[in-house]
Amino acid sequence: LMREIPGMVVINPSDDVEARAAVHAAYDHVGPVYLRFGRLAVPVINDREDYKFEIGKGIVLKEGTDVTIFATGLEVSESLEAAKMLEKDAISAEVINIRTIKPIDEELVVASATKTKKVVTVEEHSVIGGLGSAVAEVLCEKAPTKMMRIGVNDRFGESGPAVELIHKYELDAEGICKIIQQVQRRLSYRRIWQSFFA
């Protein structure tokens, strides 16, 4: 919803370090800014000395070659954990923190999608209108790519402990890993069948 408002900047920090930096960036920005914060305490992932927050810029947290995971907010730490799990299946996942959903870092989205040829977005938000939609819009126009959105599907949200809800909607590391493994298997089977009949 906020992404549709003209001139609105939408920021979704991934940890407390980024949240603090985002507040400073919002204060310095001329124009409206919507800061979105998750309820869960998350590990600090932005503790490097060279860390810098810039509106409209994402950051590559882990290099990969098989699939790109674009994540935002508390799903960034879950996606990093999922990427570690995927390594056990020999799946190399690139993890990118999209801290600004609007304006989105189009250059980074296109570069990573072009590199890995497969994209997954992860957000603790509806798959409609959020990060998944923003990434899909960029790729549709600039770099058509196989893509899957992980988030809350077209349904009303529920109340409850945040940890339980994250697990229920498969937005934890295990759920993200499982979904990506399933997609990777389907694509592998398709390649095998295509080569068999070639």
Cite the ranges covered by each PLM segment:
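Conserved thiamine diphosphate
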Residues: 1-28
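Divalent-metal (often Zn2+) His-rich catalytic cores of metallo-beta-lactamase-fold enzymes
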Residues: 35
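Thiamine diphosphate
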Residues: 38-198
